[in-house]
Design a protein with these regions (language model features):
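Extracellular/surface-exposed low-complexity segments
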Residues: 321-375, 415-417, 443
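Structural signature of tandem-repeat unit edges
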Residues: 5-17, 30-47, 56-75, 85-101, ...
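Short beta-strand elements of solenoid repeat domains
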Residues: 82-83, 105-109, 131-135, 157-161, ...
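Small-residue (G/S/T/A) turn/hinge positions that recur once per unit in extracellular repeat modules
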Residues: 16-24, 48, 52, 76, ...
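Extracellular beta-strand-rich solenoid/capping regions of secreted or surface-exposed proteins
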Residues: 14-28, 405, 433
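Signature tryptophan residues that serve as conserved aromatic anchors
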Residues: 173, 225, 289, 339, ...
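Secondary-structure capping and domain/repeat boundary segments
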Residues: 371-452
Length: 452
């Protein structure tokens, strides 16, 4: 044991290795081990490398130029390098991974690793990639573009907390067998582009936190996804703070039970079409749109009231229009300001009035933020084009009144005033702030006859 305690470097050449090497090079056996090199060996008989290099002292691992005279027996690489937090150099070009079924946690916690070349990996038999690269915080480059993921069922947390990863090409991945995408890209805070437009997610049931914290991602194309099997979408896009466009209009949400925090913190999102969402199975919508500070309108045509909707609209400070199903009976967190029914011009002075009013509706209703104002225009003996002597305009605070000019026989029009004494002339160039009555001022026309 004292001899093993002093070994820093292990080199294995021209040897035949067989059986399981699970946990073989860990710090429990080699407490000061810094490097391992396996070269020109026969690895056909190796069955497991699970946790083989999971050690905090290891800095370099080279496995290259090896032979496989017979079909490889290697089935598991689970946690092979997990928490090898000093590992900076890695060459796995001599591994035949064609029979491997699990790569779960394989590189998780490799917090010093900056580059990883896996372009030669045969992943055709792999079913589990859970947390495969999780918390490899310095990883900037990684080529996984040729991964055969046709057998993979679990991609949960696969790239979680890869905070330095700027590029990731998964555009050609076959995800038809995947059922779990919980946190697949969560907190990839440096990822600027991500093409998942061709993902087949028809078998996926779990999408919790899938893109949460992808804070520099500006675009994400999920428009053609078949989400009919998904049951959980909570926190799915939370804190995607740079996301300006997101088309979820075709999402089939009929099986979804939770949408809590789904879009929370998407502070750059100006438009979001969820009008086709079927929320009949949803029980939790808490914080669903929380702090979507740029969102101007929401169409919730098919929404129903869930059991939990705490602060669903909190922080939607730019929201000025809300079209709501009559089955959605509460608006938790909505700005406590004036709203009005755009169809019936009913003024609702605060949140409580809005909610009470909407609970009495039997059809979807559109509400606009603002105070409903009226401007009564008294022609004072004159008349408008339609022969009316009085005209009423309806506007909302912030809009502009129309300047309408009446006529009166024998007089010319001298403007609109806020008082009958004609001392306070009305300024149509200013936005509407209060309701008012205006009075037309007339000046009699005189005919002056000058004798010849």
């Amino acid at each position: 044991n004292s001899y093993l305690n002093s070994i820093k470097h292990i080199e294995i050449e021209e040897a035949t290795l067989t059986g399981s090497f699970a946990s073989y090079f860990r710090d429990t056996g080699f407490p000061v081990l810094e490097s391992v090199r396996i070269e020109q060996c026969n690895l056909s008989g190796v069955t497991s490398f699970a946790r083989a290099f999971s050690t905090s002292t290891l800095q370099k691992v080279i496995i290259r130029d090896n032979d496989y005279p017979t079909a490889p027996s290697l089935l598991t690489m689970e946690s092979m390098f997990s928490n090898a937090n000093k590992l900076t150099e890695l060459d796995l070009s001599g591994l035949d991974t064609s029979a491997v079924t699990t790569m779960r946690d394989m590189f998780s916690g490799c917090s010093a690793l900056e580059e990883l070349d896996l372009s030669h990996f045969d992943t055709s038999s792999v079913t589990n990639m859970n947390n495969m690269f999780g918390s490899s915080g310095k990883l900037e480059k990684m080529d996984v573009s040729n991964f055969d993921t046709s057998s993979v069922t679990d991609m949960s947390y696969m790239f979680a907390n890869c905070t330095s990863l700027e590029e990731l090409d998964v555009s050609n991945w076959d995800t038809s067998s995947v059922t779990n995408m919980y946190g697949t890209f969560v907190n990839c805070t440096s990822l600027e582009e991500l093409d998942v437009s061709n993902f087949d997610i028809s078998s996926v049931t779990e999408m919790t936190s899938m893109f949460r914290g992808c804070s520099v991602l500006e675009k994400l194309d999920v428009s053609n996804w078949d989400t009919s099997s998904v049951t959980n979408m909570q926190v799915m896009f939370q804190n995607c703070t740079s996301l300006e466009e997101l088309d979820v209009s075709n999402f089939d949400t009929s099986s979804v039970t939770s949408m809590a925090h789904m879009f929370g913190g998407c502070t750059s999102l100006k438009e979001l079409d969820v009008s086709n969402f079927n929320t009949g199975s949803v029980t939790n919508m808490a914080y669903m749109f929380q702090n979507c500070t740029a969102l101007k309108s929401l169409y919730l045509d098919n929404f129903t009231t869930p059991k939990t909707m705490t602060d669903m609209f909190t922080g939607t400070t730019s929201l000025t229009y809300l079209f709501v199903s009559h089955n959605l009976r509460a608006f938790d967190g909505l700005a406590n300001t004036s709203w009005y029914d755009e169809k019936n011009w009913v003024q609702l002075s605060n949140y409580a009035q809005l909610q009470t009013y909407h609970q009495q509706q039997s059809e979807p209703t559109g509400y606009r933020k603002g105070t409903f104002l009226s401007l009564t225009m008294d022609a004072m003996g004159g008349e408008f084009e339609d022969a009316e002597e009085q005209k009423v305009q309806n506007k909302v605070s912030g809009e502009y009144w129309d300047e309408i000019v009446p006529v009166k026989e024998g007089h010319y029009f001298d403007g609109w005033y806020l008082d009958r004494n004609f001392t306070n002339k009305f300024d149509f160039s200013l936005p509407a702030t209060v309701s008012a009555t205006l009075y037309a001022k007339w000046v009699e026309n005189y005919t002056v006859v000058i004798p010849a």
